[in-house]
Amino acid sequence: MFANFRVYVARRRAFYGDYFAEYDTNADYHYDATGLGRIHKKGIPSVLCLTSPITAHSNYKLDIENSTDFSICAGIKTENGFEYAHDGKTKYTLTSKGVTEHCSYAVFECTREDGSSYTETLTLSDEGAKLTVKGKGKFAITFPAFLYDGKTETSVTQTENSLSVTYNGYTCTYITDGKITDRNIIAANRNGHYKLYIAEGEKEITLEIKMYFPEYHTK
């Protein structure tokens, strides 16, 4: 079993089995956004979950104008609503990383400009990716539902605590111990259009990301 965690300047890359994830902790907002911007599974189309963060200040042209930056990341509730780490106002500090027999993991201390902080833990295993956020207050994890690659539309199904996206037979499923809410935002990168959602919770929130091949659903 191949498991690893590597650091490349402001980018942190995690590997375990067929899963790969990449954080950008100091993004260039002409191209990227701070947070978890890439998560793939070997053999599955990279666009299905997220293959590139979304920026509202891109140096390249898109067919729609983005109203927000975006990565998979935490948001903390304030009097103005949720404030997300993808806005560039959160400092990510890697405090712990490692590999066990069953997973690789990384723990970040996330500090906002007002001094508030929380921990964000990414775990990769054969089962998929898991993001856990802990701290004082109310938190959300924002995540994307891939909609359209310019030719093919996806199918999206949602319950209170799960959401699945199916694209050419491949499926990405998000599962949370909180409640899923639509942010009513559609954003784009060079791979296509995404609809943005959040999973909400108190003091702690977990989001699991699992990707499946077409044959998984036909057995």
What residue spans do the PLM features occupy?
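Extended polysaccharide-engagement surfaces of secreted carbohydrate-active enzymes
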Residues: M1-I180, N184
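Beta-strand-rich recognition/accessory modules
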Residues: T166-K219
